[in-house]
């Protein structure tokens, strides 16, 4: 089996109104060799059924999808950790299940990471609400120290869902989410 370029981790809990758009945007990515890990955090609604229905529409991606089920709700950090433990890709991308992404997002981030030999790359994003949407431009930095300072000072948003992170960074530094 070919090693995945990117493992996408998607926690699922009470998102039946959003999950279809999220999964479609992931299944239609232009990047090949993507592993999709969906973690059902004991969601009591129909989110996982919707997920399965959408995955069926994409037979070429179906074998790249893992659905892991928690027997009880453990919370978002635990769901992310479950996904990390299963991930095999060179890079990790976290996607919240109420998000949707541009169709070339993973390819753009992956190509930039490879071009720069980067451990972490990030992108701008939109915050979408029922009545409006805001474009959130993220600053660019040329050194790791500058990026870290910006993250710690709040100049750059610290969300995980707009960043592609080398999996070895998690493994080598024993990084997990506080659960």
Roles of regions detected by a PLM:
Residues 92:
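Short aromatic/hydrophobic "clamp" motif used to bind/position activated sugar donors
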Residues 69-87, 108:
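Glycine-rich, basic loop-to-helix element that forms the pyrophosphate-binding segment
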Residues 124, 136-155:
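Short, flexible, basic/aromatic active-site loop/helix in glycosyltransferases
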Residues 1-28:
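N-proximal low-complexity "stem/linker" segments adjacent to membrane-targeting elements
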Residues 149-179:
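Conserved nucleotide-sugar donor-binding catalytic segment
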Residues 96-100, 119:
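The conserved acidic donor/metal-binding loop of glycosyltransferases
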Residues 104-135:
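Conserved donor NDP-sugar-binding/catalytic core segment of glycosyltransferases
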Residues 23-69, 114:
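Acidic donor-binding segment of Leloir-type glycosyltransferases
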